[in-house]
Amino acid sequence: MNKKLKGKIALVTGGSRGIGFACAMKLAEQGASVFLASSNPERLQKASEIIREKTSCESAFHAADLRIMEGCQDTADSLMKHFNRCDILINSAGATKGGIFPEQPDEEMLDGFALKFHSAVRLSRMLWPELKKNSGCVINIVGGFSRTPSKDFMVGGAVNAALGNFSKALANQGLQDDVNVNWVHPGPTVTERLQEIFETKARQQNLKAHEIQEKTIASEGLRRLGEPEDVAELVVFLCSPQARHIHGTGISVDGGGSKGYY
């Protein structure tokens, strides 16, 4: 089989589970060596081992607090020490919290920006010279609430909107430096984080988590919830030579749940 990413090196933040792990797995299936980053060393080690076993591609990892500058710098340094190269950056770290706005503490907004937004900005900047040298690509995992605000997801919506805006500006820089930049807007996707959201809403509404899931599918007119692999398939395509003319674009993977036309 012709593996379209053979020889490429990819850093995937949030790579120990969920969408990040699915992206790392699909990248490795296409021949890329992957470097996973998140805060939990045990999950990272397990994820890395699974990828190696299933794909026979090299997989390494680094545990760090990506909310802070030192964690991002350590991750970038560890990546370069291990592979001495970076072709692909997937910023997938960061699960922001939903909630009732008047009851949400300031720390939840600050934490959301620190992990999801600032880590993407910092790692993009730190690795930009390497990505420029290799005509690489950046894919940011954003989210539909960046374009469709919700009173129940104000923190995530604000963080995602900022990341989407940054992504477009970064794409303009990428035109100058030959770095492809795109971003993806997942809809409701089956992950541990989504299950936590369903359980929280269930407690608030005195329902079962599966009832909240059914209501979500029905209210958005979906056939089903998304799977992490749905997002990962698009991410891998956007990293491939076949997608090189797709640049500076946000694409939804939400089963048609977006209400707007863009």
Predicted regions and their residues:
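Conserved glycine-rich cofactor-binding loop
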Residues: 9, 16-18
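Catalytic loop of short-chain dehydrogenase/reductase
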Residues: 137-163, 167-176, 188-189
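Alpha-helical segment proximal to the catalytic Tyr-Lys
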Residues: 129, 172-173, 244
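Substrate-binding pocket helix/loop in short-chain dehydrogenase/reductase
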Residues: 100-113, 216
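Conserved glycine-rich Rossmann-like NAD(P)H-binding loop of the short-chain dehydrogenase/reductase
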Residues: 30-47
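Short, small/polar-rich loop/turn modules that mediate ligand/substrate recognition or access, typified
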Residues: 175, 180, 246-248
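Short C-terminal tail/terminal secondary-structure segment
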Residues: 6, 148, 236, 247-262
